[in-house]
Design a protein with these regions (language model features):
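Extended alpha-helical targeting/anchoring segments
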Residues: 5-405
Length: 405
């Protein structure tokens, strides 16, 4: 683990840019923002030992009255399972864990919390290209489908990267993406490494000061209609569709099982099942799971039970993660990890880092897209869904490298 002081962090950021280290969270549905700037320390972990040392340092800082904000990469979840741990550091250049330690959130009128506008019609991302054409996707899909037929897993969330070029100010891009697709869990993370822009609609988990935890698994996607009547018909079709319900219920059951490991017996509840949330390009099926946490848990305990979120792995979870490691070319990095904040009280909130871009200093941008595959899925429909989900970042730009579907 590398713990960097505030002056070191600022120096590292300004070597490459004029941006001070900061993290901005925004709920676009309410307009509420929460900004963290001027970190006293930045925790960066690249190995198993560094991750667990970093989590301990985070807990120590929280208990001393500090706030924490940052991200944990998808592959860090491998570290909580001995049989997967060796996969965590394969072929990666980005951190497994990156969190700032802060004295307090900044006021809403802080300059870094204010909108920064781009020029009209200026594209932030250009030259998007799928790293898997349809033939490649079909091959991975068929191999996954074989696992499903053999009963090795019941569902798995197969993902692929889209690469593009980026230019300009990431803050301006963050605000432009809000206009394209408002979400509840938007985040911009700029702590000196790759800049992370997340447009996640999905809550991973939230805990409160009284010890309650809730999670909102999201599974089931349909394209928006062109009229309100068509939208309503699509939503009713989703609610009646056995495949969509089965996908969502499998993840609900997985998360109920995960949460039960760290919560009091008799408190587990599913207050919402098969709810539909509507976004500019898609409808999503969402359910809610909640329970009362056992006393005296630390962030490591919660992550060991829940991370990564079952909605972006599959079921059974460990089997699905093992199969996906075999099928996907490289690390997901921040994508499908978690981005969030922790208060001194122990209350915390993390989103599932879907619809999330990683911006590298050389002008390269990477974001993954994917979906849950079950036994009656088809490669054509799933690949088209992947391309649809890419629209949050690139709008109507054509995606190169897809081949014929």
């Amino acid at each position: 683990m590398r713990g960097r002081s505030a002056s070191d962090a600022l120096s590292e950021c300004t070597k490459m840019t004029d941006r001070p280290p900061h993290i901005l969270f925004r709920d676009d549905t309410s307009g509420q923002v929460m900004l963290f700037a001027d970190p006293t320390e930045i925790i960066v972990a690249h190995t198993r030992a560094e991750v667990f040392t970093g989590l301990a340092r985070m807990e120590e800082a929280r208990k001393s009255g500090k706030w924490l904000a940052g991200y944990i990469a998808y592959e860090a979840g491998h570290l909580f399972e001995d049989k997967l741990a060796r996969f965590a550091t394969e072929n990666r250049t980005t951190p497994l864990l990156c969190f700032g330690i802060f004295d307090h959130p900044q006021p809403d009128d802080h300059p870094l919390a204010q909108p920064t506008q781009r020029l009209e019609n200026e594209e932030f991302l250009t030259a998007p290209k799928a790293t898997w054409d349809f033939a490649t996707y079909q091959n991975r899909f068929d191999r996954l489908h074989h696992h499903l037929m053999q009963g090795d897993c019941y569902q798995a969330n197969l993902t692929m990267p889209i690469e593009a070029r980026w230019s300009g100010d990431p803050r301006a891009a963050f605000w432009s993406l809000i206009e394209r697709q408002p979400v509840k869990y938007g985040a911009l993370v700029d702590l000196g490494g790759p800049v992370i822009l997340s447009r996640s609609p999905e809550l991973f988990f939230r805990t409160d000061e009284e010890g309650w935890i809730e999670t909102h698994p999201m599974k089931g996607t349909a394209r928006r209609g062109s009229t309100p009547a068509e939208d309503e018909a699509i939503k009713q079709t989703m609610l009646a569709d056995i495949k969509t319900q089965a996908e969502n219920r499998m993840i609900v059951d997985l998360l109920r099982n995960d949460i039960s490991r760290i919560t009091e017996v008799g408190t587990l509840d599913v207050p919402k099942l098969f709810d539909i949330e509507t976004y500019p390009t898609v409808h999503q099926m969402v359910s809610h799971v909640q329970a009362k946490l056992l006393p005296n848990l630390e962030i490591r305990d919660i992550l060991a039970a829940l991370f990564p979120c079952g909605s972006i792995t599959g079921a059974p979870k460990i089997s699905a993660m093992t199969i996906l490691h075999e099928l996907e070319d490289g690390p997901r990095d921040v994508y499908c990890g978690a981005i969030g904040m922790i208060a001194p009280s122990g209350a915390m909130r993390f989103s599932v880092a879907i619809r999330t871009l990683t911006l590298f200093d050389d002008g390269r941008a990477v974001f993954n897209v994917g979906g849950g595959i079950v036994i009656d899925s088809t490669a054509e429909a799933e690949y088209e869904e992947c391309l649809l989900k890419a629209r949050f970042a690139i709008g109507d730009q054509p995606i190169a490298g897809t081949g014929s579907v």
